[in-house]
Design a protein with these regions (language model features):
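Short glycine/serine/threonine/alanine-rich loop segments
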Residues: 21-22, 110, 141
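Short, hinge-like loop/turn segments at secondary-structure boundaries
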Residues: 40-44, 107-108, 131-132
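Glycine-rich, Arg-bearing micro-motifs that act as flexible, cationic patches
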Residues: 1, 112-138, 148, 152-155
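Small/aliphatic-rich secondary-structure junction motif
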Residues: 1-54, 149-152
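Structural beta-sheet core signal
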Residues: 25-27, 115, 145
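A structural signal for isolated positions on well-ordered beta-strands in alpha/beta enzyme cores
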Residues: 22-24, 89-91, 144
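Short, well-ordered secondary-structure micro-motifs
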Residues: 35-38, 102-103, 125-126, 155-156
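Structural beta-alpha unit
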Residues: 4, 18, 66, 70-113, ...
Length: 157
């Protein structure tokens, strides 16, 4: 997840506590690029490559989901068990991030979508990241946008 995920999660948990709501954590990863695919093809035979795509990717994604949950558990500490119970699922899905998020909004029938304005600090000078902008444009549910912390600190000066 992005650098600001814990900050976004704090907002999500505060809202969930206030409204006694459940949380679904969705993280989208871009599909494997051509370079990575060609490297795998160089070292794996066709059967091993097919097995990697079917099982290896599932294993990698399951490990990412577990690490995300573990990082939230660590972030919340011993007092956060009740907050952790609010998290119904952590889903890591491959695809275009904005489309993955919008698809999950529909599949999970969510009432409110909470997103960070940027996933990491690289685009800190732009007012809104690509994924956040696209989600804001296309979402059919209200979107709660959490601003980048660095931007807020700079503007406070």
């Amino acid at each position: 997840l992005g650098l600001y995920a814990p900050f976004v999660m704090q907002h999500a948990l505060a809202l969930a506590r206030t409204f006694n709501a459940d949380l679904y954590v969705v993280h989208a990863v871009e599909p494997m690029g051509l370079f990575a695919e060609s490297v795998l093809q160089s070292y794996l035979d066709e059967q091993a490559l097919n097995e990697f795509h079917s099982q290896g990717l599932k294993t990698v994604i399951a490990n990412i989901e577990q690490r995300v949950l573990d990082s939230f558990r660590e972030e919340l500490g011993d007092d956060g068990e009740q907050d952790l119970q609010r998290i119904r699922a952590v889903r890591v899905l491959q695809g275009d991030p904005s489309q993955v998020i919008l698809d999950q909004v529909h599949k999970l029938s969510v009432d409110l979508l909470i997103v960070g304005s940027h996933s990491h600090g690289v685009g800190a000078e732009t007012p809104l990241g690509r994924t956040a902008a696209r989600v804001l444009q296309l979402a059919k549910v209200p979107v709660y946008l959490v601003p980048l912390m660095e931007r807020r600190r700079r503007e406070d000066r």
